[in-house]
Amino acid sequence: MEKVEASMHGWAQAPYGTKAQVDANYKRMLHYGCMPDNARYVQFGVASHNLFDLCYAMLLREREGVRDQVEFEMLEGMANHQARVIRQAAEGLLLYAPVVLKEDFHSAIAYLVRRLDENTSEENFLHDLFGMTPGSRSWEVQKKRFLKACQEKDEVKYGPNRTQNRAADPIQPSHYRDAFANERDTDWSLRQNAEWINGMIAAEKEKSGEEIPLVIDGEEITTNLWGVGRDPSRHNEVSYKFAYADFDQVEHALVTADRARSSWASKSIGESAEILHRAAQELSRIRGEAIAAMVRDAGKAPTEADVEVSEAIDFCRYYAEGLDRDGMNDGVEMSPLGTICVMSPWNFPFAIPTGGVAAALMAGNAVVFKPSELAVYTAWQIVQAFWRA
């Protein structure tokens, strides 16, 4: 699961990457737990079916004088003969067993099968236990692994593998013909990222009363027709105002787009792609502001808004490379449609319109953007990022 999670979100894997690292850290933890200054505050349980580790812990607790604070734990139904010997040698053993109602007995079997599957993987001690004797090949393999872990216990890295910091990490630029890679989502398990977005949302809550104009031919236009945007969490309050377009202004926008499309369509694939890559970089730069805008404008949870920003960035980079893949131009002549109107919904106010705008622009079209009237403030963040690009 950890591998899947890391791969899906573009994060470092949270646990160690190899069994050897896990084994070395286990020895480090044994030493830490058996230190008298630590052991006196807890009842320290050593859970394992590895005889090398169990015996190592027995010797360690005797050496450190913490016998009463360190106990041993094993699973019922798995190497019971080994458990009996450990119980006698350690003068006690905590034995775990699943307890279920009779009609749920299959759940207990599933639990034990899962444990058995984990513990009998090729590198695990139980994999070799039943055919192992001192001096045998499997014994020597396990002995070598144990000694290697002991040697590396003070060298193995400990602490979080994930260090993402949205407040400090630099924005990673991308360029035309770079290999596509999904934008990394925000790792909300990290305190610094939670503090970062809390600050963004707090700053957004201080804003109110903005007036969002129409923008046609580079000119900001206000009208006598105003709509109001509301924060779903404070629905009785007007959060901001936005200008409606009348029929003449709609016509003006279409004429402007028609006039601009030939200039835009004349750009090469590489030129258009670089602009979309710059747009992706701008969207990445305003991730925090965009998340806070969606929280204010659409009632999105930060976790939901964050993946929208990632998807929007991915759209820009993906479409930037879409017309230059192998085979795309073999015997095909492509031409723009002309002017595309992108009309976006309220429930995905960031990713969907960004994808529509990016795809239309990359195909050489002019774009008229008409967002949902329930998410105009979010759309305002998007268009400004594209204009800066």
Would you name each region that the model predicts?
Residues 295, 316, 321-389:
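Rossmann-like NAD(P) dinucleotide-binding subdomain of oxidoreductase/dehydrogenase enzymes
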Residues 91, 102-255, 259-262, 266-281, ...:
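Terminal low-complexity tails and localization/encapsulation signals of metabolic enzymes
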Residues 16-24, 45-48, 73-74, 245-248, ...:
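Alpha-helix capping and helix-loop boundary segments enriched in small/acidic/polar residues
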Residues 1-179:
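Positively charged, amphipathic and often flexible ligand-engagement surfaces
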Residues 43-49, 73-75, 96-98, 119, ...:
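Generic beta-strand/beta-sheet core signal
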Residues 36-40, 60-70, 89, 265, ...:
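Secondary-structure transition/capping motifs at alpha-helix termini
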Residues 284-290:
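Extended, amphipathic, non-transmembrane alpha-helical segments
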Residues 1-3, 51-56, 62, 78-83, ...:
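Flexible loop/turn segments at secondary-structure boundaries
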